[in-house]
């Protein structure tokens, strides 16, 4: 599913596997805004699920789910006219899952889940600082 309402969006989406017929990738995207730069990739074997709902403008989002593990991501950004900068990478053979909901002022958010050990992460954040907020999390071996 792809639903883009607005203009000046830059999107670079790709999905591919290494030839395993049993691996699946699924992506869903809903922007409803303008001036977004979004790069999403889901690579290698292993099931990958990704949902994204922006409802905003001036966002930069980079997401890369790779490796042979099953990875799940559900991301929602909503913040009026403020900007977000989000970088997420879930890699490795472990099953990694993340749910992120960012609201309020600009948030520089980084999440790295990696390795063979299963990792899960959930955050529901509203940035109340006009200068912005920053969150950086790394999990795995």
Locations of regions flagged by a protein language model:
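Low-complexity repeat regions of mature extracellularly deployed or surface/particle-associated proteins
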Residues: 1-141
